[in-house]
């Protein structure tokens, strides 16, 4: 009965009311089949990831906060050594990261403020990519306006003494714990929401696996899209504001903002400003089109992004060299900026080319008619421009970008390189998942595309 209700619920919004094709009917039927628990290490892998990832973040935070940025580790690899290490980490978390009323007020005020902007700020109405069954959801793109409203309101509030510029870094650890708890609660609420609305799809029947992967693809309250909001608002802007708060703390404590901190703050600000300027492009990403909304995305969007992506700034504030903040030369800074610009423009140009092609397949690519493979499903796989060189040059640019963000920290510790290591692993895994998904989706057409464009990241190498 639940499967029938789910299917009928989707069919009501499918294909804008038009008659469903046989392919679309099959797509909808496939959503209600039991799906294998075979991603992210299956049932065991998703269970471990759910609980280990927050521990990893606490570990790096404690290393930066209490060990001058050097990674904490057991004195010995014996059972007693590991137990002592975990006991020390537990002490740091319980003593300094215990959730406080102030941290909860700060975060939920922030979350509510961003939800308010998402709901009331006018924006351009656009249709998302076709979903199984042909449905195209309408989105209001007001991120660019909300971004600038936030950047105006926050400094005004600081100027009039509503809170200090250092409020975020002063409450970093307790607020992180608040958000970790909220991520679990929010995911359970998504489970209830999907069940009540009959929107569950691609379920495996294994609790922890489905908790991690998600329940519904596009959960909404009215026209308010929960996944797009969490993906694009509270975590991303909080990440930038956390950097600014750390810079303010460095100025307060040491009387200066180091060039390294300025570079990292500018890099991240530029990246997020560009993200909102090209906001429509998110609607063609794997997260929005394919992924269900579960703990993986909830925790990633709300906690992982703002509390780990600021680690470079955090490290540069806490890591002292001869009692003073780390300084880099102008020449080194120019090298880092050049690398960042190369990675950024590669990332942006490649993604924009794909997005423009999806909007208008007739538009020329590099001055020539676009070449593509027309799949049996009717989808067009772009085979010219950047997408005729490698299948994921956008990931290449993103990886270069991630390491450029870490380089201002120089090389005393691995802690600030957490982002580069993580993001490289993420993109490699995402490439593998994307390949498998496309192989299932397009079959021989995808094999033909891979034969025509054999490399993923670097032409002639990989």
Curated annotation (Swiss-Prot):
Membrane topology: Multi-pass membrane protein
Molecular function per GO: Delta14-sterol reductase activity; Delta24(24-1) sterol reductase activity; NADP binding
Highest taxon of source: Eukaryota
Amino-acid positions noted as binding NADP(+) in the UniProt annotation, renumbered to this chain: 354, 358, 382, 387, 394-395, 434, 438-442, 449
Principal location listed in the UniProt entry: membrane
Pathway(s) of this molecule: Steroid biosynthesis; zymosterol biosynthesis; zymosterol from lanosterol: step 2/6
Reaction catalysis annotation: 4,4-dimethyl-5alpha-cholesta-8,24-dien-3beta-ol + NADP(+) = 4,4-dimethyl-5alpha-cholesta-8,14,24-trien-3beta-ol + NADPH + H(+)
Keywords for this protein: Lipid biosynthesis, Lipid metabolism, Membrane, NADP, Oxidoreductase, Steroid biosynthesis, Steroid metabolism, Sterol biosynthesis, Sterol metabolism, Transmembrane, Transmembrane helix
Protein's UniProt keywords contain Membrane: yes
GO cellular component, as recorded: endoplasmic reticulum membrane; nuclear outer membrane
Subcellular location field: Membrane
Listed GO biological process terms: ergosterol biosynthetic process
EC number(s) on file: 1.3.1.70
Role noted for this protein: Reduces the C14=C15 double bond of 4,4-dimethyl-cholesta-8,14,24-trienol to produce 4,4-dimethyl-cholesta-8,24-dienol.
Protein name: Delta(14)-sterol reductase
Annotated source species: Dictyostelium discoideum
Gene: erg24
């Amino acid at each position: 009965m639940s499967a029938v209700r789910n299917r009928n619920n989707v069919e009501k919004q499918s294909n804008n009311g038009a008659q469903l094709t046989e392919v679309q009917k099959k797509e909808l039927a496939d959503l209600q089949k039991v799906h294998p628990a075979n991603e992210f290490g299956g049932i065991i892998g998703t269970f471990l990831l759910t609980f280990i990832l927050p521990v990893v973040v606490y570990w790096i935070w404690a290393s930066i906060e209490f060990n001058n940025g050097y990674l904490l580790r057991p004195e010995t690899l014996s059972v007693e050594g590991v137990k002592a290490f975990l006991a020390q980490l537990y002490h740091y978390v319980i003593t300094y990261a215990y959730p406080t009323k102030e941290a909860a007020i700060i975060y939920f005020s922030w979350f509510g403020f961003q939800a308010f902007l998402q709901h009331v700020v006018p924006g351009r109405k656009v249709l998302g990519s076709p979903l199984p069954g042909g449905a195209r959801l309408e989105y209001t793109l007001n991120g660019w306006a909300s971004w600038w409203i936030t950047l105006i309101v926050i400094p005004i509030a600081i100027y009039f003494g509503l809170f200090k510029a250092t409020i975020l870094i002063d409450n970093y650890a307790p607020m992180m714990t608040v958000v970790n708890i909220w991520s679990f609660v929010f995911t359970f609420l998504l489970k209830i929401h999907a069940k009540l609305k009959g929107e569950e799809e691609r379920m495996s029947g294994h609790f922890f696996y489905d908790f991690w992967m998600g329940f519904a693809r596009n959960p909404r309250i009215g026209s308010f899209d929960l996944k797009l909001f969490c993906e694009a608002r509270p975590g991303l802007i909080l990440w930038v504001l956390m950097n600014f708060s750390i810079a303010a703390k460095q100025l307060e404590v040491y009387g200066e903002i180091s060039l390294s901190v300025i570079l990292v703050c500018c890099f991240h600000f530029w990246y997020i400003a560009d993200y909102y300027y090209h906001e429509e492009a998110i609607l063609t990403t794997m997260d929005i089109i394919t992924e269900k909304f579960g703990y993986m995305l909830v925790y990633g969007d709300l906690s992982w992004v703002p509390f780990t992506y600021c680690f470079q700034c955090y490290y540069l504030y806490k890591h002292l060299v001869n009692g003073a903040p780390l300084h880099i030369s102008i020449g080194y800074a120019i090298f880092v900026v050049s690398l960042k610009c190369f990675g950024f423009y590669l990332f942006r140009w490649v993604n924009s080319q794909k997005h423009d092609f999806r909007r208008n397949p007739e538009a020329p690519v590099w001055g020539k008619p676009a070449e593509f493979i027309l799949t049996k499903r009717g989808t067009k796989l772009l085979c010219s421009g950047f997408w005729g060189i490698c299948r994921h040059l956008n990931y290449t640019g993103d990886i270069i970008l991630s390491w450029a963000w870490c380089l201002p920290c120089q090389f005393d510790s691995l802690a600030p390189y957490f982002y580069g290591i993580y993001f490289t692993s993420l993109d490699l895994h995402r490439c593998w998942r994307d390949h498998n998904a496309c192989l299932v989706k397009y079959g021989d057409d995808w094999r033909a595309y891979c034969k025509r464009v054999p490399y993923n990241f670097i032409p002639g190498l990989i």
